[in-house]
């Protein structure tokens, strides 16, 4: 990756001299009682949550470096942020106050030259995940990467390979993977209580940002404290526009984000992939509304077909719904008003799983009353007592020389499945056959979307070819 010291010296650095870049042959050995030195890349919005949670507010581990292209304290918040999102929209200014001893950077490349960093969190726009995480892994640093793991299928495959080669401890930020309700769901589905699964529906109320829109004309002044060129990163340059890309609204743009499916799919499709032990899909087709050239559609239903497993009644159909699209009407009564969740249709009954909290609900409820009151209640109590925390799973794994539970051997294939669907959304109405071993569709235009182009000067060797 090419960058100049003359440009990089503008980066705010509040922590001594920089060490020369070098490739670690192995990760640093740590004792189980060590305090990790963690660096956070992207500290606004969800990055604020990740930084605090992974360090337990600085009590368990050290935040030694803060990196963000936006050095303001929260900056300009888009008007479409909900109350919860708005409360999280704290940026580098707030991070500096919480961790006053941490070095502060705009450019992750300079930050990663420090020898004292054990691990990093990556909570940036999707298009930068792979470049940052791969660079860190090749330097022997453990990585926690927010979902989606990467923006493209090819990046997911490479991330998995680099993780295996370097031996670092990895975790994708699909926090639901550690929750009681998702863990219970795995046991329920594999128990056979509702028979083998014939069909799955997964849905979200997202997007809460704009999709299905054209690129606006014009530009706005770049705010003081924002390094717009670094935010663009691997993408092709374009003018800054207030409330259009940074912050938050980048999710709807194909150049920077992955739409509602990319944002929520690694959460909500996870229980199906996990519990049913699904491999790669073999085909996908999307029906969409609100199509635009550069953004994801306003609403979609994506139909995946998976090969049979021991837990499915033959080949499995999985449907993803977003933008207000919902499950078929005959199931509307049992899914209720859950804004995000999944429905498993079995041979003997159905399971509804709300995303985020609660417990799996089995239907017809009267037929599964004894199971719900005894076995399921016991499972819930067992997992609740463990108090599993997704962030601590990762940090404990680093200290104990183990792997986390959403490590890249699991998370990368899950992310590939999600990104197969985002490609279908961009080519609506086409039945696409997917061959995971060779990273190719039976459609040239779709296959071209498996990889992305990287701006000159931002290429890294691992992602070439």
Question: Predicted regions span which residues?
Answer:
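N-terminal glycine-/serine-/threonine-rich beta1-alpha1-beta2 phosphate-ribose binding loop
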Residues: 1-142, 157-169, 465
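Structural recognition of the beta-strand scaffold that forms the well-ordered cores
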Residues: 37-41, 63-68, 121-122, 144-145, ...
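Extracytoplasmic/secreted proteins, especially bacterial periplasmic and envelope-associated proteins
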Residues: 49, 86, 90, 107-110, ...
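Redox-cofactor-proximal catalytic regions of oxidoreductases
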Residues: 58, 177-178, 240
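Short, solvent-exposed turn/loop segments enriched in Gly/Ser/Thr/Pro and often Arg
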Residues: 70-73, 105, 123-129, 149-151, ...
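Residue-level signal for alpha-helix termini/capping positions
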Residues: 113-116, 137-138, 164, 190, ...
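A contiguous active-site-proximal alpha/beta segment in oxidoreductase catalytic domains
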Residues: 142-144, 149-225
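Contiguous beta-strand/loop segments that form the cofactor/metal-binding neighborhood of enzyme cores
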Residues: 184, 196, 201-205, 210-409, ...
């Amino acid at each position: 990756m090419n960058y100049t010291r003359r440009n990089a010296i503008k980066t705010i650095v509040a922590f001594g001299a920089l060490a020369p870049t070098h490739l670690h042959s192995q990760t640093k050995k740590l004792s189980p009682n060590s305090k990790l030195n963690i660096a956070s890349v992207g500290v606004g919005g969800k990055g604020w949550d990740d930084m605090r949670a992974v360090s337990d507010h600085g009590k368990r581990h050290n935040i030694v470096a803060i990196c963000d292209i936006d050095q303001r304290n929260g900056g300009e918040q888009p008007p479409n942020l909900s109350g919860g999102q708005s409360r999280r929209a704290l940026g580098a200014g707030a991070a500096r106050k919480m961790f006053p001893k941490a070095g502060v950077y705009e450019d992750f490349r300079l930050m990663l030259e420090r020898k004292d960093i054990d691990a990093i969190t990556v909570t940036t726009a999707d298009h930068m995940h792979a470049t940052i995480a791969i660079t860190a892994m090749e330097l022997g640093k453990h990585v926690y990467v927010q979902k989606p793991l990467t923006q493209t299928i090819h990046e997911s495959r490479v991330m998995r390979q680099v993780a295996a080669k370097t031996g670092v401890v990895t975790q994708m930020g699909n926090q639901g993977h550690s929750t009681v309700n998702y863990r219970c769901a795995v046991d329920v589905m594999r128990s056979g209580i509702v028979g083998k699964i014939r069909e799955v529906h997964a849905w979200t109320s997202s997007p809460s940002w704009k999709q299905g829109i054209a690129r606006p004309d014009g530009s706005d002044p770049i705010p003081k404290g924002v390094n717009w060129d670094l935010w663009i990163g691997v993408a092709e340059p374009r003018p800054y526009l207030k409330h259009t890309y940074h912050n938050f609204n980048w999710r709807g743009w194909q150049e920077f984000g992955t739409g509602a499916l990319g944002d929520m799919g690694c959460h909500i499709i996870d229980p199906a992939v996990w519990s049913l032990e699904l491999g790669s899909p073999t085909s996908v087709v999307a029906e969409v509304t609100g199509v635009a050239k550069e953004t994801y559609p306003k609403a979609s239903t994506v139909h995946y077909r998976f090969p049979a497993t021991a837990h499915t009644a033959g080949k499995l159909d999985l449907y993803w719904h977003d933008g207000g699209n919902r499950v078929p009407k005959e199931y509307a009564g049992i899914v209720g008003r859950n804004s995000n969740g999944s429905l498993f249709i079995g041979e003997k009954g159905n399971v509804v799983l709300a995303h985020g909290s609660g417990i799996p609900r089995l239907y017809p409820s009267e037929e599964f009353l004894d199971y719900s009151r005894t076995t399921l209640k016991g499972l819930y109590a067992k997992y609740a007592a463990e108090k599993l925390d997704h962030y601590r799973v990762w940090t404990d794994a680093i200290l104990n020389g183990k792997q986390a539970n959403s490590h890249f051997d699991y998370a990368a294939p899950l992310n590939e499945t999600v990104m197969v669907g985002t490609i279908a959304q961009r080519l609506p109405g086409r039945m696409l056959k997917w061959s995971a071993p060779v990273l190719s569709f039976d459609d040239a235009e779709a296959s071209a979307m498996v990889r992305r182009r990287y701006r000159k000067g931002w290429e890294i060797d691992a992602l070439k070819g």
